[in-house]
Amino acid sequence: MKYKDLRDFIQRLEALGELRRVTQPVSPVLEMTELCDRVLRAGGPALLFNAPTGYDFPVLGNLFGTPRRVALGMGVDAGDDAALDSLRDLGRLLSALKEPDPPKSLKDAGKLLSLAKAVWDMAPKSVSSPPCQEIVWEGADVDLNRLPIQTCWPGDAGPLVTWGLTVTRGPNKSRQNLGIYRQQLIGRNKLIMRWLAHRGGALDFREFALQNPGKPYPVAVVLGADPATTLGAVTPVPDSLSEYQFAGLLRGSRTELAKCLTPGVDTLQVPARAEIVLEGFIYPQEGAPAPAPAGAPPRPAGNASAKYEHALEGPYGDHTGYYNEQEWFPVFTVERITMRRDAIYHSTYTGKPPDEPAVLGVALNEVFVPLLQKQFTEITDFYLPPEGCSYRMAIVQMKKSYAGHAKRVMFGVWSFLRQFMYTKFIVVVDEDVNIRDWKEVIWAITTRVDPVRDTVMVDSTPIDYLDFASPVAGLGSKMGLDATNKWPGETNREWGRPIEMDAAVKARVDRLWQEIGL
């Protein structure tokens, strides 16, 4: 089933028993986090808080708290297991778009043409008088404190926008970038835009600042987009395809877009049926910036974007289960807020796994598998355990063909997709190990690994700056473990033979099991 907007999706989830309305007053300060966290850990429904304490806007939480709801958001109506299979089909589609196979026949050529036509037909379309602009706040009416922005953890620096779909465009680019970056509230119309240096929004901003020094950089933030657009922003979409176009493929209909209203920001387009849209700029720094507080990291310097307004972000409780360090990021000044009538504020929290991003990671893991298999045909399965903060550890199952093969796969995974840039640990196992069962993975590590021979250490590599275990912020080491059976050339010893029961005996005991009534 396809959903034209967030409200359509909410209605469907409620009909399936996948959403619960909370009519009791619940505060966005800490209480929503605690309630959503308990419900998510129990595999419970999405929550629509109809009476957030002190606010007039309902709050939607735990929307993608199960793999089934992630699949539903992508248009797949199935149970958890079938949903994950369908997500692999989506990965195959992305793989075909990223690197199409050369056609071997007229039939194959026809399939490629059909796929190209489907992508072309899903080009976004512009609409006038969109629902997302039914209500407009301008001037003194622009006050972010009127929105029920969550404060998630006791040690957080303040309220935090968590599901903001940020729309940017680089200079001379027709394609808009969509990314989800958290944003700290620091004033009635000011947010800190926490985007890491390699993310699309940060790259667009740096390129703009380099080519247009001293000019304000336009940004729009969407709160409450339809599920296909939201999930498209967190999916590894090929660079040649816009997230809006990919959302159209998921939805089965073209994404409707509306131009922003603010002069200068009207070069950007946002989902026409979004709940709330923030329009504004990252402005150049006026005058000399105030010195950094004692003990704070130094202000950014040395590039064109450093000449724009920045502020210290954090600390905040993060997906690692810890509070992160403070860091400087650009300040986004909101000049206009547009919204639908009776707008819904979409929010989440991040914390020690499992949290909502970890569940999204489990679902998107299935999308990654076909992408990896397209590049590395020896990979038979791939798993990002949610306990590893969604991306910091990867377990790879492979069909090994020669000595050193596992190490080749390690470096291939680290370098293939941007999503694996921050993966610290990779464990490679053979086909006989179920990589989704920790008992089997640990058995393979403890019986097939020699720490000196089978450990690969790589120093001075890009690391998530939130990873305080690294000696330098943003730069650290990676480790690979070859837990495969060793081939000649990798060992001089006779390798152990796994114990297996005789097949005929197993069949006999299967029958006996039923007779005994065990």
Curated annotation (Swiss-Prot):
Q: Which domain of life is it from?
A: Bacteria
Q: Which pathway is this protein assigned to?
A: Cofactor biosynthesis; ubiquinone biosynthesis
Per UniProt, what is one GO molecular function of this protein?
metal ion binding
Active-site residues, record numbering mapped to chain: D318
InterPro entries noted in UniProt: UbiD, UbiD-like_C, UbiD-like_N, UbiD_bacteria, UbiD_Rift_dom
Kind of enzyme, top EC level? Answer: lyase
Q: Which GO terms describe its cellular component?
A: cytosol; plasma membrane
Ordered alphabetically, the record's keywords are: Cell membrane, Decarboxylase, Flavoprotein, FMN, Lyase, Manganese, Membrane, Metal-binding, Ubiquinone biosynthesis
Under catalytic activity, the entry for this protein gives: a 4-hydroxy-3-(all-trans-polyprenyl)benzoate + H(+) = a 2-(all-trans-polyprenyl)phenol + CO2
Q: Identify the residues that bind prenylated FMN.
A: I180, Y181, R182, R194, W195, L196, R199, G200
Residues engaged in binding Mn(2+):
N177, E243
Entry annotated with the keyword Manganese: yes
User: Which biological process, per GO, is one annotated for this protein?
Assistant: ubiquinone biosynthetic process
Query: Can you say where in the cell this protein is located?
Result: Cell membrane
Q: How does it sit in the membrane?
A: Peripheral membrane protein
Co-factor binding comment: Binds 1 prenylated FMN per subunit.
Enzyme Commission no: 4.1.1.98
Needed cofactors, names only, are: prenylated FMN; Mn(2+)
Q: Tell me the HAMAP family matching this sequence.
A: UbiD
Family statement drawn from the similarity comment of this UniProt entry = Belongs to the UbiD family.
User: Which PANTHER family does this UniProt record tie to the protein?
Assistant: 3-OCTAPRENYL-4-HYDROXYBENZOATE CARBOXY-LYASE-RELATED, FERULIC ACID DECARBOXYLASE 1
Query: What function does this protein fulfil?
Result: Catalyzes the decarboxylation of 3-octaprenyl-4-hydroxy benzoate to 2-octaprenylphenol, an intermediate step in ubiquinone biosynthesis.
Question: Assembly state and interactors?
Answer: Homohexamer.
Q: What is this protein called?
A: 3-octaprenyl-4-hydroxybenzoate carboxy-lyase
Name the species this protein comes from. Burkholderia lata (strain ATCC 17760 / DSM 23089 / LMG 22485 / NCIMB 9086 / R18194 / 383)
